[in-house]
From Swiss-Prot:
Species the sequence originates in: Mycoplasma genitalium (strain ATCC 33530 / DSM 19775 / NCTC 10195 / G37) (Mycoplasmoides genitalium)
Keywords from the UniProt entry: Cell membrane, Lipoprotein, Membrane, Palmitate, Signal
Listed name of the protein: Uncharacterized lipoprotein MG149
Signal peptide: 1-23
Transport in keyword set: no
C-alpha cells in the first residue's frame, strides 16, 4: 500500500496540461465523467498497442534494409529479434503501466477531495471537497503536425514544407461548481532508438547494420485552473485546444481577463488528512 501511494505521489509533480464540445451538465454528471475517463484510458491502450512493432514488422524492415547482403541480413535479423524479445521480457517484469494508468485515473476521479494544490506563494490548499460536484466535462483535442522537409542544393539552399494535420483526443477537462477546471491528459514523447548488429564477411570487410526504431512514451498529467466564476466548459476546451495546437495563448489569456484565472499545481494527495495552509475556497 505504501508503494502504491508512493507511485501516485511520484507521478503528480510532473504535472502539466494537455474538441469535443460539451453541452449542459447531465443529471448523473459524476458517473458520466467517470465513464468518459475509463474510455480515455482504454483509448490510451490502443495508442500503445499501435506504437509497438511486432516481430514480423521488425523482420520486414531488416529484410528491406539489408536485401543486398543476405548473410548480414540474417545476422541483423537475429539481433533485432533478440532485442525485441529482451524488451518484452523487461516490460513484463515491471509493473503493468497500462493497469497503473487506469488505476490512477480512476483514483483521481474517485478521490477529488484528496487533491492538494499549490497556490501562488507556495500555500497548500484543498479546493475540491465532496460538496464540490462535477459540473461538466469534455474531451481535449490537439492538432498534430507532420512536417516533411525536402532540402535542395542549388545556388541557395532552401526548404519545402509539406504539412499533414491530424486531430486526436489527448485528454479530458472537468469543471466543478466552485470554478475549478481540472485537466487530465496524456503526453506522447517520441524517442528514436538505434539497435545495431555487426558481422564480418568472408572478404574481411566489417559491416554494421543499424535499425532505427521510434518508441512512443505516454504519461499521465494533471493540471488545475481556478476561476472566480464557473462558465461553460466548451469555452475552456476551445481555448486550450487553440493554445496547444497553434502555440497561441490569446484565447487562454482572454479567459483570465474575463474570469480571473489562477493556475494551480497539484502537488500531493492528502493521504493522512494532514492539515493544509488554507481552507477550501
Amino acid at each position: 500500500m505504501k508503494l502504491y501511494r508512493s507511485l501516485k505521489a511520484a507521478l503528480l509533480p510532473g504535472i502539466c496540461t494537455s474538441i469535443l464540445l460539451a453541452s449542459c451538465a447531465s443529471t448523473n454528471t459524476y458517473q458520466d465523467q467517470r465513464n468518459a475517463l475509463i474510455s480515455l484510458a482504454s483509448n490510451r491502450d490502443t495508442l500503445i498497442a499501435n506504437a509497438k512493432k511486432s516481430k514480423e514488422e521488425v523482420q520486414k524492415e531488416v529484410t528491406k534494409m539489408n536485401s543486398s547482403t543476405s548473410s548480414m541480413m540474417t545476422a541483423t535479423q537475429s539481433v533485432a529479434i533478440t532485442t525485441h524479445q529482451t524488451t518484452e521480457k523487461t516490460n513484463n517484469s515491471k509493473y503493468d503501466l497500462d493497469k497503473l494508468f487506469k488505476d490512477y485515473i480512476l483514483y483521481v476521479v474517485d478521490n477529488f477531495s484528496g487533491l492538494v494544490f499549490k497556490r501562488t506563494g507556495g500555500h497548500r490548499i484543498q479546493l475540491i471537497d465532496k460538496d464540490k460536484e462535477i459540473l461538466d466535462g469534455g474531451n481535449l483535442t490537439k492538432h498534430t503536425h507532420h512536417d516533411h522537409n525536402h532540402m535542395h542544393n542549388h545556388e541557395h539552399e532552401h526548404e519545402e514544407h509539406h504539412d499533414e494535420e491530424e486531430t486526436e483526443v489527448v485528454g479530458r477537462a472537468l469543471s466543478f461548481t466552485n470554478g475549478i477546471f481540472l485537466v487530465i491528459d496524456y503526453k506522447k514523447d517520441s524517442e528514436r532508438k538505434n539497435m545495431s548488429g555487426s558481422t564480418t564477411m568472408m572478404h574481411q570487410h566489417h559491416h554494421e547494420a543499424e535499425e532505427h526504431k521510434e518508441e512512443r512514451k505516454l504519461s499521465l498529467n494533471l493540471k488545475a485552473y481556478k476561476f472566480n466564476t464557473p462558465f461553460n466548459i466548451s469555452e475552456f476546451i476551445s481555448a486550450w485546444h487553440h493554445k496547444e495546437s497553434h502555440n497561441s495563448d490569446t484565447e487562454f489569456n482572454n479567459l483570465h481577463n474575463k474570469y480571473d484565472k489562477e493556475e494551480l499545481d497539484i502537488i500531493d494527495y492528502n493521504f493522512e488528512e494532514k492539515a493544509v495552509d488554507e481552507t477550501i475556497a
